[in-house]
Amino acid sequence: MNNGYLYIITNEAFPEWVKVGTTTNLISRLHTYQTGDPFRRYRIVYSLQHPEFREAEKRIKETMKHFALEIKGEWYKIDLHMAKSRLEEQLDEYNNALPQQEKVKISCLMA
């Protein structure tokens, strides 16, 4: 198992769009975005730990592809709450295959 994070980033300059991605370090990931924006408007508004975060991201992207800015993009024109629920659904699906004592709890950050 590779523990990492699924996250949602927003930027007030693009209020209807969210970015969904993965990382093993939320702070350094946010800093890479901030260097491209002189106003530092990117915010991680939601994240959760997931033992199989890269595979979960692939499934999320598949379910959200019709909201994407471009085919291989990570920016989606989708309501923040809907995007958040897509991340949580992936953790629920992962947990459904585990015995009760091994289930992963949602541990998240919200802005």
Outline where the language-model segments fall.
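Non-catalytic accessory segments flanking enzymatic or RNA/DNA-binding domains
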Residues: 1-111
